[in-house]
């Protein structure tokens, strides 16, 4: 069974409005077009950068052309690969697009990545030159003389240039007044080399062509179509495929993109009031947790009022979904009829809250006009989805991988099936196959997710054997994810094949959905399940300390206020394990082997300690390594 894109009238109209992108020969060709039509509209704004900058589309196009001429002057040729190790900023964009305009590709990574990873990328992509964010990155690399000699130049985007590096302003001055030589390659030329997140093993280089990226810039119009000048926020790492494609798309619409950071996001949301933003689930979890923290400071009577309004709105929206058959599981005619009645009964209070309460809350949470909150990089926990839907923020969950540029599916505003990752993008096909024999499966049958489309890479950089493992002769890419197709063509993910926990009984457990159920608890900040080759599952839990201490006290268990760095009081752990198993038992389709034999409290997983990727995915192997002694104790080893 294969599911492919079936265009609606809305999507056809949106693609037609965005047809200029489909006609572009290369990604970098979009800037003269934008300068000609939207030259005076603000394009990029970086208020928090080391050098705050703001350019309109005319100025941005001019700087990109100047950078391209400068790169050519310093020896960059068609087909070269230049490493770019820096974070989000207008200068990153100018360097990136200047390299493309000069005919080169960039191999990108964040400035804060481990030095060993940066050195590996520099060597693996055979970079002929290097662009770094600042002197610190260049010094940390500490390249040996023979590797330095292979680089034609080192360009520094910020600060006083270090020894052996060139400063940004001097670099641009070297290209001023020169006409950049146009690139020889077209759509099939490599535009960039991205590296997989490396949650396990060495990262692999993924060469993406201009055609791959242009497909994203065009097809995302099926999901969102903001008007020229509309404000958007960029908060995710620009060197990640998801933010990269989203940024290109929003800018190709003529939007004004403000660069923010996780630290500044709370202030920038009400200030910028974005129409659209590319996000990850962890961001929405943090926003919802912040709401809960603020709610606890209110008088009890006001807390009860808000919680009652929230529960009613969540129930009303769920009833509407059920009536419209927008659920993962099919709903009978009788069930849809009952849902219509429930939605009608709850409508008056929901309408009142939607007039008096939720607009104020939306302004505080997202700025008040976020029409396209696109979430990718992982599944959204059901309780997070339900909360934001209740207050009037419809999360548009998408799915993709670095190897697919990345978006292959996304929920549409008019077809938003909660629990799914949406419908295929234009010209994209899905197939679900049996994990054991590779035979195609039917609707609602779970198996490995295969995808084919114009956004899929041709293969890993210099790794033909690894490429052959994931790409077949017909162009089908094995995502490594597990999922199923719904009758309307939507794809729903159920887990990651390599994350599957196989118990000693031979039963396969997908930890993702179980972990989503557990983090719905106000007691749990983060969780990772373990149990490979064991009789039962176990849980590594990062607690919400204040909430868990108060909860334990109500149950008659006295624990220390500071829970950090300790496995936990035995009485507390037994209590917490029972609570976890209660939550797991409540899951739809819950199985008896999806229960925990024990839990331990662990320190947080973060980007800083290397246990989360830059897109906030757990590095399960590293977490296991850090907490191996606690896991051994959990199983009595």
Residues of each region from the PLM?
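Structural core segment of the AMP-binding/adenylate-forming
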Residues: 73-74, 101-170
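Conserved AMP-binding/adenylation subdomain of ANL enzymes
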Residues: 214-233, 238-334, 340-355, 359
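Conserved pre-ATP/AMP-binding loop-to-beta segment of ANL
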Residues: 39, 156, 173-195, 202, ...
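AMP-binding/adenylate-forming catalytic core of the ANL superfamily
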Residues: 113, 130, 453, 458-459, ...
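AMP-dependent adenylate-forming
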Residues: 12, 29-55, 600-607
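Conserved ATP-binding/catalytic segment of the ANL
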Residues: 424, 428, 437-444, 448-503
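Conserved AMP-binding/adenylate-forming core of the ANL superfamily
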Residues: 42-97, 114-119, 167-170, 210-211
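Conserved AMP-binding A3 loop
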Residues: 54-58, 191-217, 620
């Amino acid at each position: 069974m294969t599911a492919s894109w079936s265009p609606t009238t809305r999507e056809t109209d949106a693609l037609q409005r965005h047809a200029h992108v489909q006609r572009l020969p290369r990604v970098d060709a979009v800037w003269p077009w934008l300068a000609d039509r939207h030259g005076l509209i603000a394009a990029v704004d970086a208020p928090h950068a080391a050098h705050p900058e703001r350019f309109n589309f005319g100025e941005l196009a001019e700087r990109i052309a100047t950078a391209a001429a400068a790169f050519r002057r310093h020896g960059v040729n068609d087909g070269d690969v230049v490493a770019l190790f820096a974070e989000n900023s207008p200068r990153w964009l100018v360097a990136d697009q200047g390299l493309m305009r000069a005919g080169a590709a960039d191999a990108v990574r964040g400035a804060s990545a481990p030095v060993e990873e940066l050195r590996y990328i520099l060597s693996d992509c055979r970079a002929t030159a290097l662009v770094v964010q600042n002197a610190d990155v260049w010094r940390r690399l500490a390249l040996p003389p023979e590797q330095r000699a292979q680089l034609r130049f080192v360009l520094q985007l910020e600060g006083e240039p270090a020894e052996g590096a060139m400063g940004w302003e001097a670099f641009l001055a070297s290209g001023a007044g020169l006409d950049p030589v146009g690139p020889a390659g077209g759509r099939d030329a490599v535009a960039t080399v991205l590296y997989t997140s490396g949650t396990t093993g060495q990262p692999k280089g993924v060469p993406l062509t201009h055609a791959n990226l242009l497909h994203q810039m065009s097809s995302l119009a099926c999901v969102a179509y903001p008007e020229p000048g509309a404000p958007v926020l960029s908060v995710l790492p620009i060197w990640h495929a998801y933010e990269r494609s989203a940024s290109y798309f929003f800018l190709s619409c003529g939007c004004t993109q403000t660069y923010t950071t996780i630290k500044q996001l709370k202030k920038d949301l009400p200030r910028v009031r974005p129409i659209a933003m590319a996000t990850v689930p962890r961001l929405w979890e943090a926003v919802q947790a912040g709401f809960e923290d603020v709610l606890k400071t209110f008088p009890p009577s006001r807390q009860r009022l808000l919680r009652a309004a929230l529960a009613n709105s969540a129930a009303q929206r769920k009833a509407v979904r059920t009536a419209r058959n927008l659920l993962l599981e099919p709903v009978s005619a009788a069930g849809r009829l009952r849902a219509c009645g429930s939605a009608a009964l709850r409508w008056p209070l929901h309408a009142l809250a939607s007039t008096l309460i939720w607009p104020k809350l939306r302004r505080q949470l997202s700025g008040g006009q976020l029409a396209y909150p696109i979430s990718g990089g992982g599944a959204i926990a059901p309780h997070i989805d339900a909360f934001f839907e209740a207050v009037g923020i419809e999360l548009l969950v998408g799915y993709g991988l670095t190897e697919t540029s990345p978006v292959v599916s996304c929920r549409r505003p008019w077809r938003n099936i909660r629990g799914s990752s949406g419908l295929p993008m234009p010209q994209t096909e899905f197939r679900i196959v049996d994990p054991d024999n590779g035979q195609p499966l039917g609707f609602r049958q779970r198996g490995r997710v295969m995808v084919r489309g114009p956004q899929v890479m041709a293969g890993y950089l210099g790794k033909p054997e690894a490429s052959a493992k994931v790409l077949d002769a017909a162009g089908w890419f094995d995502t490594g994810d597990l999922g199923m197709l719904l009758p309307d063509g939507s794809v729903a993910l159920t887990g990651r094949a390599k994350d599957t926990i196989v118990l000693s009984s031979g039963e396969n457990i997908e930890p993702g959905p179980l972990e989503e159920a557990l983090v719905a608890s106000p007691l749990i900040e983060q969780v990772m399940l373990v149990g490979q080759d064991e009789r039962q599952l176990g849980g590594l839990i990062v607690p919400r300390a204040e909430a868990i201490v108060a909860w334990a006290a109500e149950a008659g268990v006295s624990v220390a206020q500071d829970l950090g760095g300790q496995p936990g009081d035995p009485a507390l752990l037994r209590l917490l394990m029972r609570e976890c198993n209660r939550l797991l038992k409540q899951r739809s389709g819950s199985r008896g082997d999806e229960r925990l034999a024990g839990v331990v409290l662990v320190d947080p997983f973060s980007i800083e300690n290397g246990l989360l990727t830059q897109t906030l995915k757990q590095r399960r192997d590293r977490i296991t390594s850090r907490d191996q002694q606690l896991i051994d104790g959990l199983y009595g080893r």
